[in-house]
Protein backbone atom coordinates (compact mmCIF):
# COMPACT_ATOMS: atom_id res chain seq x y z
CA UNK A 1 0.00 0.00 0.00
CA UNK A 2 1.34 3.43 -0.90
CA UNK A 3 0.50 6.74 0.75
CA UNK A 4 1.17 10.11 -0.82
CA UNK A 5 -0.11 13.65 -0.48
CA UNK A 6 -1.79 15.72 -3.17
CA UNK A 7 -3.10 19.21 -2.43
CA UNK A 8 -2.82 18.63 1.35
CA UNK A 9 -4.88 15.43 1.15
CA UNK A 10 -3.54 12.02 2.03
CA UNK A 11 -4.23 9.56 -0.77
CA UNK A 12 -3.87 5.82 -0.30
CA UNK A 13 -3.46 3.46 -3.22
CA UNK A 14 -3.94 -0.24 -2.66
CA UNK A 15 -2.51 -2.62 -5.23
CA UNK A 16 -3.49 -6.24 -4.83
CA UNK A 17 -3.00 -9.21 -7.09
CA UNK A 18 -5.92 -11.04 -8.67
CA UNK A 19 -5.57 -13.96 -6.26
CA UNK A 20 -5.67 -11.58 -3.26
CA UNK A 21 -8.80 -9.89 -4.56
CA UNK A 22 -10.46 -13.27 -5.03
CA UNK A 23 -9.51 -14.27 -1.47
CA UNK A 24 -11.14 -11.11 -0.14
CA UNK A 25 -14.31 -11.66 -2.16
CA UNK A 26 -14.49 -15.33 -1.13
CA UNK A 27 -14.15 -14.36 2.54
CA UNK A 28 -17.46 -12.48 2.12
CA UNK A 29 -19.20 -15.42 0.51
CA UNK A 30 -18.81 -14.32 -3.12
CA UNK A 31 -18.32 -17.27 -5.47
CA UNK A 32 -15.08 -16.87 -7.38
CA UNK A 33 -13.09 -18.94 -9.82
CA UNK A 34 -11.01 -21.38 -7.75
CA UNK A 35 -7.27 -20.89 -8.03
CA UNK A 36 -4.01 -21.59 -6.25
CA UNK A 37 -0.87 -19.42 -6.33
CA UNK A 38 2.42 -20.95 -7.44
CA UNK A 39 5.95 -19.56 -7.27
CA UNK A 40 7.52 -22.11 -9.62
CA UNK A 41 6.53 -24.82 -12.13
CA UNK A 42 6.63 -27.62 -9.53
CA UNK A 43 4.15 -25.72 -7.34
CA UNK A 44 2.07 -24.96 -10.45
CA UNK A 45 1.65 -28.65 -11.27
CA UNK A 46 0.83 -29.44 -7.62
CA UNK A 47 -1.79 -26.67 -7.71
CA UNK A 48 -3.29 -28.06 -10.91
CA UNK A 49 -3.49 -31.56 -9.40
CA UNK A 50 -5.18 -30.14 -6.30
CA UNK A 51 -7.71 -28.28 -8.48
CA UNK A 52 -8.48 -31.50 -10.35
CA UNK A 53 -9.11 -33.28 -7.05
CA UNK A 54 -11.27 -30.46 -5.66
CA UNK A 55 -13.20 -29.38 -8.77
CA UNK A 56 -12.84 -32.11 -11.38
CA UNK A 57 -11.31 -29.69 -13.88
CA UNK A 58 -8.76 -31.02 -16.36
CA UNK A 59 -8.04 -27.70 -18.09
CA UNK A 60 -6.39 -24.82 -16.26
CA UNK A 61 -5.77 -21.12 -16.77
CA UNK A 62 -2.22 -20.02 -15.93
CA UNK A 63 -2.29 -16.32 -14.99
CA UNK A 64 0.67 -14.03 -14.34
CA UNK A 65 0.28 -12.09 -11.10
CA UNK A 66 1.48 -8.52 -11.57
CA UNK A 67 -0.07 -5.18 -10.72
CA UNK A 68 -1.33 -4.34 -14.22
CA UNK A 69 -4.16 -5.10 -16.57
CA UNK A 70 -3.78 -6.38 -20.10
CA UNK A 71 -1.94 -9.49 -18.92
CA UNK A 72 -3.67 -11.74 -21.44
CA UNK A 73 -2.73 -9.62 -24.46
CA UNK A 74 0.84 -9.48 -23.16
CA UNK A 75 1.12 -13.27 -23.02
CA UNK A 76 0.60 -13.55 -19.28
CA UNK A 77 -2.66 -15.54 -19.31
CA UNK A 78 -2.74 -18.88 -21.11
CA UNK A 79 -4.93 -21.96 -21.23
CA UNK A 80 -3.33 -25.29 -20.28
CA UNK A 81 -5.18 -28.42 -21.40
CA UNK A 82 -3.04 -30.86 -19.38
CA UNK A 83 -0.35 -31.00 -16.68
CA UNK A 84 2.52 -30.93 -19.20
CA UNK A 85 1.18 -27.64 -20.54
CA UNK A 86 0.88 -26.30 -16.97
CA UNK A 87 4.62 -26.98 -16.57
CA UNK A 88 5.53 -25.51 -19.97
CA UNK A 89 3.41 -22.37 -19.60
CA UNK A 90 4.43 -21.66 -16.00
CA UNK A 91 8.10 -22.00 -17.06
CA UNK A 92 7.45 -19.40 -19.78
CA UNK A 93 5.56 -16.95 -17.57
CA UNK A 94 7.44 -17.05 -14.23
CA UNK A 95 10.45 -14.77 -14.56
CA UNK A 96 9.29 -13.11 -17.78
CA UNK A 97 9.17 -9.34 -18.22
CA UNK A 98 5.48 -8.85 -18.94
CA UNK A 99 4.78 -5.74 -21.00
CA UNK A 100 1.21 -4.45 -21.19
CA UNK A 101 -0.36 -1.05 -21.87
CA UNK A 102 -0.49 -0.58 -18.08
CA UNK A 103 3.15 -1.38 -17.25
CA UNK A 104 6.25 0.79 -17.60
CA UNK A 105 7.97 0.38 -20.99
CA UNK A 106 10.34 -2.23 -19.55
CA UNK A 107 7.40 -4.25 -18.20
CA UNK A 108 7.13 -5.97 -14.84
CA UNK A 109 8.80 -9.19 -13.73
CA UNK A 110 6.39 -12.04 -13.01
CA UNK A 111 7.20 -13.79 -9.72
CA UNK A 112 3.98 -15.78 -9.24
CA UNK A 113 1.25 -17.38 -11.30
CA UNK A 114 -2.31 -18.22 -10.38
CA UNK A 115 -3.31 -21.69 -11.52
CA UNK A 116 -7.05 -21.26 -11.93
CA UNK A 117 -9.93 -23.61 -12.43
CA UNK A 118 -10.98 -23.70 -16.06
CA UNK A 119 -14.23 -21.79 -15.80
CA UNK A 120 -14.16 -20.40 -19.33
CA UNK A 121 -13.59 -23.36 -21.62
CA UNK A 122 -16.05 -26.13 -20.73
CA UNK A 123 -15.67 -29.35 -22.67
CA UNK A 124 -13.66 -29.30 -25.86
CA UNK A 125 -14.73 -25.97 -27.34
CA UNK A 126 -13.88 -22.43 -26.36
CA UNK A 127 -16.74 -20.16 -25.37
CA UNK A 128 -17.12 -16.45 -25.97
CA UNK A 129 -15.45 -13.90 -23.73
CA UNK A 130 -17.09 -11.09 -21.85
CA UNK A 131 -15.81 -8.40 -19.50
CA UNK A 132 -17.15 -7.53 -16.05
CA UNK A 133 -15.41 -5.24 -13.59
CA UNK A 134 -16.37 -3.50 -10.36
CA UNK A 135 -14.54 -0.23 -10.00
CA UNK A 136 -14.74 3.07 -8.20
CA UNK A 137 -16.29 5.95 -10.12
CA UNK A 138 -14.03 8.71 -8.83
CA UNK A 139 -16.43 11.45 -9.92
CA UNK A 140 -19.28 10.15 -7.75
CA UNK A 141 -17.40 8.12 -5.15
CA UNK A 142 -19.62 5.11 -5.87
CA UNK A 143 -18.89 1.62 -7.08
CA UNK A 144 -19.76 0.97 -10.68
CA UNK A 145 -20.11 -2.26 -12.62
CA UNK A 146 -18.62 -1.99 -16.10
CA UNK A 147 -19.39 -4.80 -18.53
CA UNK A 148 -19.37 -5.77 -22.19
CA UNK A 149 -20.03 -8.82 -24.35
CA UNK A 150 -17.08 -7.74 -26.48
CA UNK A 151 -14.57 -7.72 -23.66
CA UNK A 152 -12.15 -10.18 -22.26
CA UNK A 153 -8.58 -9.55 -23.28
CA UNK A 154 -9.50 -6.87 -25.83
CA UNK A 155 -11.46 -4.51 -23.55
CA UNK A 156 -9.03 -1.63 -24.16
CA UNK A 157 -9.62 -1.91 -27.92
CA UNK A 158 -13.38 -2.08 -27.38
CA UNK A 159 -13.18 1.09 -25.29
CA UNK A 160 -11.16 2.86 -27.98
CA UNK A 161 -13.03 1.77 -31.11
CA UNK A 162 -16.57 0.83 -30.02
CA UNK A 163 -17.25 2.45 -26.64
CA UNK A 164 -21.01 2.08 -27.15
CA UNK A 165 -20.55 -1.66 -26.52
CA UNK A 166 -19.40 -1.03 -22.94
CA UNK A 167 -22.17 -0.65 -20.36
CA UNK A 168 -22.05 0.68 -16.81
CA UNK A 169 -24.31 0.38 -13.82
CA UNK A 170 -23.65 2.62 -10.81
CA UNK A 171 -24.35 1.14 -7.38
CA UNK A 172 -25.94 3.34 -4.71
CA UNK A 173 -24.06 2.52 -1.47
CA UNK A 174 -27.24 3.03 0.58
CA UNK A 175 -29.08 0.26 -1.30
CA UNK A 176 -26.42 -1.95 -2.89
CA UNK A 177 -26.90 -3.74 -6.18
CA UNK A 178 -30.63 -3.88 -6.87
CA UNK A 179 -32.46 -6.75 -8.55
CA UNK A 180 -33.45 -4.65 -11.54
CA UNK A 181 -29.79 -3.71 -12.07
CA UNK A 182 -28.67 -7.34 -11.92
CA UNK A 183 -31.38 -8.30 -14.43
CA UNK A 184 -30.31 -5.47 -16.76
CA UNK A 185 -26.68 -6.61 -16.60
CA UNK A 186 -27.65 -10.24 -17.22
CA UNK A 187 -29.87 -9.25 -20.15
CA UNK A 188 -27.11 -7.16 -21.75
CA UNK A 189 -24.57 -9.96 -21.35
Describe the role of every protein-language-model region:
Residues 52-61, 79-100, 151-153, 163:
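Active-site cofactor/substrate anionic-group-binding motifs, chiefly glycine-
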Residues 18-26, 55-72, 100-123, 132:
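ATP-grasp fold ATP-binding core
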Residues 104-173:
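Hydrophobic alpha-helical hairpins/lids featuring a short glycine-rich hinge
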Residues 30, 36, 58-61, 76-77, ...:
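Structural motif
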Residues 170-189:
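Glycine-rich, mobile lid/loop segments that gate access to catalytic sites or pores
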Residues 1-13:
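Short, Lys/Arg-enriched N-terminal segments with co-localized hydrophobic residues
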Residues 13-58, 64:
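A conserved helix-loop-beta module that forms one wall/lid of the active-site cleft
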Amino acid sequence: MWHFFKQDKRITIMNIHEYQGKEILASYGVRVQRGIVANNPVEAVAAAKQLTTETGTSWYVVKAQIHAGGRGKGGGVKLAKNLDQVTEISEQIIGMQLITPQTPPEGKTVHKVLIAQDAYYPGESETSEFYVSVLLNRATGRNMIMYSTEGGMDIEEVAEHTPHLIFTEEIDPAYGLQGFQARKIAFNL
